[in-house]
Design a protein with these regions (language model features):
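A short beta-strand-to-alpha-helix junction
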Residues: 48, 103-116, 159-167, 178-194, ...
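Structural scaffold positions in well-ordered secondary structure
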Residues: 4, 74, 120, 138, ...
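Short beta-strand segments
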Residues: 13-15, 70-78, 110, 137-142, ...
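A long, amphipathic alpha-helix that forms part
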Residues: 54-64, 94-136
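Histidine-centered active-site microenvironments of extracellular/periplasmic hydrolases
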Residues: 132-177
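Active-site-proximal alpha/beta segments of enzymes that process anionic O-linked groups
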Residues: 1-96, 213
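Short catalytic/ligand-binding loop motif for oxyanion handling, primarily in non-cytosolic enzymes
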Residues: 19-26, 41, 79-86, 146-150, ...
Length: 281
């Protein structure tokens, strides 16, 4: 964010959920953003705030100074809150073969995702109407997935496990001047900052100087990833997930079932601890 500000970008930060909760974005990523607005000013419930957020973004974009570039951050909340508008259609049927309660909630979740997608459509249509779409990098992602006990292990929601359903997120990048493509290798949110700094701002330093990731357009491979929650973290490898608690650990297989035969990956754990300590102050 400091580099973005140094390049004269106008900042439009809009969040449906308070950005000071849990991850403290107001004290980390947006610590130096002037006049930072903490949350959407109005709206009935998460879906209402998401709609207002979209209106406010479109209004802000129309009033910004056209001579300077802009950076927008739009944080939608209806999907994670599982709160689509009561009158929203279509309703997306749930594929989960589970209890009626889980099927009903999964239907609400998928419908909420469809609703947020419709709001993103408004954002993209507005950029196109202003003839800005082909001059704007657009990144769509999420901070986590949502689980509905697909594995039958009893895990639901988010922040309850390091399963595929909770860790996998969308990551869609529209980059003017680049041909459409698909990245098949494992990627991480840690790759977004190095991508922007190297590919947009021309940073010549190796990404390891300032981040734990690498450019999405490089061929760098992750042999392991660190995924963290509020009290524990996991080292994720292709064949296993090692969850480290304050007073112990557990090793799980690809299906996230507890493994009694696999041993903890000592080299990967050591490297993960060293990597996590590099930027800790």
């Amino acid at each position: 964010m400091d580099v973005i500000r140094q390049h004269g970008y106008q900042l439009g930060i809009f969040a449906s959920s308070p950005i000071y909760r849990l991850v403290d974005l107001d004290r980390t990523a947006f610590a130096h953003v002037p006049n930072l607005r903490m949350e959407s000013s109005s709206g009935d419930g998460s879906s209402g705030r998401d709609r207002v957020l979209t209106d406010e973004w479109i209004n802000w974009l129309g009033k910004r100074g056209p001579s300077n570039p802009f950076f927008g951050f739009l944080y939608y909340n209806a999907a994670v809150s599982v709160e689509p508008p009561l009158d929203y259609h279509p309703t997306i049927p749930a594929p989960v073969r589970a209890s009626e309660q889980l099927r009903s909630r999964n239907t609400l979740y998928l419908t909420a995702v469809h609703y947020v997608d419709s709001l993103l459509g408004r954002v993209l249509d507005d950029l196109e109407r202003r003839k800005l779409l082909n001059q704007t990098i657009v990144i769509v992602t999420s901070d986590h997935g949502i689980e509905f006990d697909e594995s039958g292990l009893g895990f639901k929601g988010h922040g309850t496990a390091y399963s595929e359903e909770q860790m996998r997120t969308p990551l869609v990048v529209r980059w003017p001047g680049r041909s459409p493509g698909h990245v098949a290798r494992r990627t991480s949110h840690n790759d977004i900052a190095p991508t922007l700094l190297t590919e947009l701002f021309g940073c010549a330093n190796p990404p390891s100087d300032y981040a734990s990731g690498s450019s999405l357009f490089s061929e760098a491979q992750w042999s392991w990833l660190v995924v963290a929650s509020y009290r524990e973290f996991a080292v994720v490898e292709p064949e296993r997930v090692t969850v480290v608690f304050p007073a112990g650990y557990e090793v799980r297989g690809q299906d996230y079932r507890l493994s009694r035969t696999q041993t903890p990956p000592r080299d990967a754990l050591r490297a993960a601890m060293q990597e996590m300590s590099r930027f800790y102050r």
